[in-house]
Amino acid sequence: MANKIPENLATILKEIGETPATSLWDCHGTWVINHKSLEKVAVRFGIKFDDPIIIETDQKNKCVVLTVRGRRNVIAENGKVTEVTDWSFGEATPYNNKNGYPYAMAEKRAKDRVILKLIGMHGDTYSEDEADDFKNSKPKGVR
């Protein structure tokens, strides 16, 4: 069973008009969030993305590896605005992606990871698109 939902994650979900029941589920003790909610989080926090950089592509074999960099402004206690950036890989290959659209899956995985990093939740919460096991465990009530 997963630990209690982190308070900051529950607050973020409330700010985007979602609830844990509509956005999260427990997969073997790890919180998983749906992609739709992460897109809303990116808008709420003003996260912007650079164009992806394709590291490897093999269209015939449906293999794509790319990186995405994201950024957001953070206001410090002293009122100073600082731009915070982070990046991640997104991979889609036949062994980790059953969909017929590897470029879109690689991009979704990379962006979702960057969003989670930029809000301080990566490692505590995962995106539904990071693993088929996560998506397959999604309850019917979660959109």
Describe the predicted segments one by one.
Residues 1-143:
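Polyanion-binding surfaces on beta-sheet-dominated domains and ring/shell assemblies
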